């Protein structure tokens, strides 16, 4: 499980994993939020009064980003359709947002949903990401919801020994599969990347082999880029 063993964060495991009642299960496919999400905001959907009065701060603030498949075809430059949705800084804000957004299985094919540390953009060109890379896991279509949640909890709960290396994560929804990628900032630090990859597999109880690709190689070779680390 994601947050059972490590005690790095000052927030307890129960506080991270305590999920208030899910408030919305009726979003239309392809939508992220149940109300108008046309503008980015740092204010999440309202938390319950009791939780809001006693917030549990996270070590880092995080921002959800969405790349709408319907907008991609209208954009000339790669990445220009990615937009921030919400920024959260407490456990309560995270659950308030998570319970009001679609999970990967309900997103339209072609959608990309990101969660990155605040002020880091989910792009190769971002200075923090430029020298990094990513681990990637693959799932059958509609089967990544739980692994996506556990990935988020592992990141925001600071459960990785090399958490400072982590930039964020993205889930890509495609016709036949879904992919979750964990982005890191210093690809050349093999020890840190291997540690992150191993812990991620443990958190998700993922048994297949995963590979790590440098962003620089991905930019040069696209899909022909080869894994530098494999576990």
UniProtKB/Swiss-Prot annotation:
Modification comment: According to the redox status, the Cys-129-Cys-167 disulfide bridge may have a role in regulating protein function by affecting its ability to bind capped mRNA.
| Composition-biased stretches (Polar residues) | 8-18
Q: Which residues bind mRNA?
A: 74-79, 106, 124-125, 174-179, 219-223
Record's compositionally biased regions (Low complexity): 39-48
What this protein is called in its record is: Eukaryotic translation initiation factor 4E-1
Q: Name one GO molecular function term.
A: translation initiation factor activity
Pfam families linked to this entry: IF4E (PF01652)
Biased composition annotated in UniProt, kind: Acidic residues: 23-38
To which protein family does this belong?
Answer: Belongs to the eukaryotic initiation factor 4E family.
- Keyword annotations for this protein? Cytoplasm, Disulfide bond, Host-virus interaction, Initiation factor, Nucleus, Plant defense, Protein biosynthesis, RNA-binding, Translation regulation
Look up the domain of life of the source: Eukaryota
Please give the residue ranges the record annotates as the region Disordered.
1-55
Give its localization: Nucleus; Cytoplasm
- What the protein does? Component of the protein complex eIF4F, which is involved in the recognition of the mRNA cap, ATP-dependent unwinding of 5'-terminal secondary structure and recruitment of mRNA to the ribosome. Recognizes and binds the 7-methylguanosine-containing mRNA cap during an early step in the initiation of protein synthesis and facilitates ribosome binding by inducing the unwinding of the mRNAs secondary structures. Key component of recessive resistance to potyviruses such as peanut stripe virus (PStV). (Microbial infection) Susceptibility host factor required for viral infection by recruiting viral RNAs to the host ribosomal complex via an interaction with viral genome-linked protein (VPg).
Chief location category: nucleus
List the cysteine pairs that form cystine: 129-167
Q: In which tissues is it expressed?
A: Expressed ubiquitously with highest levels in young leaves and roots, and lowest levels in flowers.
- Null mutant: what phenotype? (Microbial infection) No significant resistance against peanut stripe virus (PStV). Plants lacking both eIF4E and eIF(iso)4E exhibit an increased resistance against PStV.
Region: EIF4G-binding; residue ranges are: 56-59, 66-102, 150-159
Biological process (GO) annotations? defense response to virus; regulation of translation
Does the keyword Disulfide bond feature in the UniProt annotation? Answer: yes
């Amino acid at each position: 499980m994601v947050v059972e063993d490590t005690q790095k964060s000052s927030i307890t495991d129960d506080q991270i994993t305590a999920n208030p009642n899910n408030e919305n299960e009726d979003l239309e496919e392809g939508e992220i939020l149940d109300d108008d999400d046309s503008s980015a905001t740092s204010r999440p959907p309202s938390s319950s009064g009791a939780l809001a009065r006693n917030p549990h701060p996270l070590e880092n603030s995080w921002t959800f980003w969405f790349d709408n498949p319907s907008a991609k075809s209208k954009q000339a430059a790669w990445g220009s359709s990615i937009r921030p949705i919400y920024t959260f800084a407490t456990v309560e804000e995270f659950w308030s947002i998570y319970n009001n957004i679609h999970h990967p299985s309900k997103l339209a094919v072609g959608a990309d949903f990101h969660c990155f540390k605040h002020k880091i953009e989910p792009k190769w060109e971002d200075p923090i990401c430029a020298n990094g890379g990513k681990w990637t896991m693959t799932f059958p279509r509609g089967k990544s919801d739980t692994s996506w949640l556990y990935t988020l909890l592992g990141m925001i709960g600071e459960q990785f020994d090399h958490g400072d290396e982590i930039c964020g994560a993205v889930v890509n929804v495609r016709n036949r599969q879904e992919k979750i990628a964990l982005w890191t900032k210093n690809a050349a630090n093999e020890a840190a990347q291997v540690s992150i990859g191993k812990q991620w597999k443990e958190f998700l109880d993922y048994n297949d082999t995963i590979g790590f690709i440098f962003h620089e190689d991905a930019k040069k070779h696209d899909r022909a880029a080869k894994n530098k680390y494999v576990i």
